[in-house]
Amino acid sequence: YPVYQDQLTEKKLSVNGRMFEWDKDFSMNLQSATSIFQQSAANGSWITTETVFVGYGIVDSANNDYKGLDVKGKIVVVLEGTRGQGNAANLLNSPTSLNGKINAARNNGAIGLLLVSKDFPKRNASPVTGPMYFTKQATAANNFITVNISEAVASALLGRTSIQNTASLLESKKATYKADLKLVAKKETLNLESSNVLGLIEGSDKKDEYLFITAHYDHLGKRDTVIYYGADDDGSGTVSVLELAEAFVQAKKKGKGPRRTIVFMTVSGEEKGLRGSAYYGNNPTFPLDKTTANLNIDMVGRIDPSYKGDSTNYVYVIGEDKLSSDLMKITDAVNNKFIKMELDRRYNDPKDPNRFYYRSDHYNFAAK
């Protein structure tokens, strides 16, 4: 199936003609890059001659870092963190969080924010690609530029002759600073293709009904110099599908085949947002109204540290009672008679914050 993805092909930042390095001194997401491109005069280049330093950039009942400053139509320079207010910065939309600082900048008329971060050079490569789509579409701009910058970039913008740390930068006057800031962002849309792989064993008297057994065969791949192989997530599920397919083939040869047709399907794009199963749900090979169930296998490598030694004969079971009043009973009966595994249903709790039921490929069957 076709998928489309935007990718940054060029990203540059300079201050007074001095070039800084991607991931060593600055980074941005694709939405901000799109905003830069759309606001640029030509060729994805955006230039300003002044920025406004606003300290931590916090506006709340106790602080207003924008008091007396005109930031309308300008880029603000904001320090990461807060004034020793514990975990308040971790709250998603608190005034001291990144979202809170962006909202404060927007509300005061700024068109962008440069966040001074201590996390440079970055340990892991910043992503240069956006979400995947089934139809060709441009990454939406958020009409606000947000760029993470190093203390070196901030020092140059504030006219320091040497690199200053955050504590020293905080002593700078909240004011407008003259400096030629140039941002360049260009992108292209990649035309990609991915695949779901299907195989089936035809049923007998109910062969026009379909039971799906699924797993995803993609993982995170390579990030910077680290390869994420995905042995558990979800190599374990993929080989389980293959083993089950082989077992049912042997059973059918012995005259003990299934009554319903079993479809064994490995899907791609799960880590990108359940893309493969979503595509199948929108473009089914077999009628969805004749699909009786989907048993999805994800991360069954049994590596949970809470199970040790002889207790590793377990599996987490999630979602069997969401749409069916019989599946849990069947699961328990078959397990008690044959497998005798520990069926751990802790993550099936609707109040569980992980919400695993909504985070793997079975959900695209359930949603239909």
Locations of regions flagged by a protein language model:
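Mature extracellular/periplasmic domains of secretome proteins
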Residues: 42, 66-71, 102-111, 128-137, ...
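Short helix-loop-beta-strand segments that form the rim/entrance of peptidase-like active sites
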Residues: 246-273, 297
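Structural recognition of the beta-strand scaffold that forms the well-ordered cores
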Residues: 51-54, 75-79, 112-116, 145-148, ...
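A conserved hydrophobic secondary-structure block that centers on an alpha-helix together
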Residues: 52-124
